[in-house]
Amino acid sequence: MFDSHDDDLWEVPSIDVNVPVEAAPAVETVPAVETVPAVENVPAVEPAETAAPADAVAPAEDEPSTDDYAQAVAEAPEDDGYDMDGLDGKLLEHFGGKIVRKDLTALMKRGANVPTFVLEYLLGMYCSTDDEDAVAEGLERIRKILTDNYVRPDESERIKSKIRELGRFTIIDKVTAKLDEYKDIYVASFANLTIEPFVMPAEYVRDYSKILQGGIWCIMSIEYRHPMEEEDEFGMEVFGDDAPRRSKAKRKKRGPEDSPFSVASLTPIQMPNLDLDAMIDERQYFSRDEWLNMLLRSAGYEPSELSEKERLHFIERMVPLIERNYNLCELGPRGTGKSHIYKEVSPYAILLSGGQTTTANLFGRMNSMRADRVGLVGHWDCVTFDEVAGMRFKDTNAVQIMKDYMASGSYARGRDQINADASMVFEGNINDTVQNVLKTTHLFDPFPPEFNNDSAFFDRIHYYLPGWEIPKMRSSLLTGHYGLITDCLSEFCKEMRRKDFTHHIDRYFRFNSDFNWCNFNHIVSPFFPLILLTLLNNVHNVL
């Protein structure tokens, strides 16, 4: 029988996810904006005292990124030293445990095809220090964890066998659970480890509710118990000539509770929650430019290489992540890293490569079961169409449904009227100078014919980001300084989506009779997200 206390078995690394972050003092005042309310504290994570287990498995991931940002990372020179600046010192002081050196991210990303937010969470745990020796030791620990414990889809059967042979094995994978209300159990499954659904202990669901909300990357110790021998109704083992007949008569359908796999321990390697109020409280220690630079560095960019206008263009790319039902269009030259924010920074955004999808995939199936009733717009915070020239819908009503959704945040499918919050981003390339394009056509020309001349569709876009004003990605645009781990940044954006400040615009602005509702909506929608991202000081009192 398996002994769970066997010293030869690997243990999950001791990671303390319950260390509270000290709340910073009150937020300084900014004339035109008032403050945002508190949210619970972000648990800071401390590095484990012991070395990472040799059997921990790293999470399976998508194919290597081919976007322009990733190309710039691959071409970046090796770092031969690190010089801290004043902003680095402030981040170490006020966001310890939730920051990482972005040059280390680029270094690790070259050899580890792991989600950036998972990689940076590990870097934040083991390398959030200015001690170079400790950083080097932390990097080796992370490499070992990812090498030994990361579950790759093509190695799933090998990992399953290892769990069986050892009795217990530690893995890194994304786990998702849902409640089976008829059996009163939580049924879980992995993203990459192909085992049948199993029972998730209720305490983990209570502690980490994100397991129920799309899943969470975790370090988990998985146990295996050998199934009991099947017995007949008299308690005798089934064998001989009667075995097939009697076994078939007695056989019952197996469920999650019959799975030989079970979770012995679970530790998130994503932020399980974020204290928005504590993060906003730290804003008072940063000037407007420092806060702006911190956001850019957190996304991987070096602000000292950008002009003021370029910095704001990069910040604008974040707006769909913090504002619900926001429609952004960015068209410009190739190689400006349009998709990086939505592909690598936020796990709540989905990038549709080639821009192709179906009406059912995007907006759900008509009159279907609840699980399929809402499409991508109901499951993601941001849906990004990459290469808008490739947008194609076989359903002729798709464009009308999309226009309805972009205008109101709701749409009709069959008998149902469905509401959703996802923002939409449209990206594409302009292969000529703006001057030449304007001589023959218009700036929405890259869109396909069914959209190209539809003014009602373009009227629903809140912001047109001029991609020709953004520099092409190069190695010098990649920061080597400290920034928030991308998971912290994405959770900040996620929490900010829950807040609505648009009704406070009347306290600071008056619109004359020339503004209709569409004009008003197009001004308000980009205004407050940009205020929140760049100022944020005194938004507490606004509520």
Q: How does the language model describe each region?
A:
Residues 47:
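Cationic, low-complexity basic patches in intrinsically disordered or flexible, solvent-exposed regions
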Residues 324-327, 531, 535-539:
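Amphipathic alpha-helical interaction surfaces
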Residues 2-17, 21, 39, 61, ...:
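Extended acidic low-complexity intrinsically disordered regions
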Residues 20, 25, 31, 37, ...:
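Intrinsically disordered, low-complexity proline-rich tandem-repeat tracts
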Residues 417-424, 429-536:
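Phosphate-sensing "switch" segment of ASCE/P-loop ATPases
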Residues 68-298:
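Extended, charged/polar low-complexity intrinsically disordered regions
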Residues 302-436, 441-445, 459:
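Conserved ASCE/P-loop NTPase catalytic core
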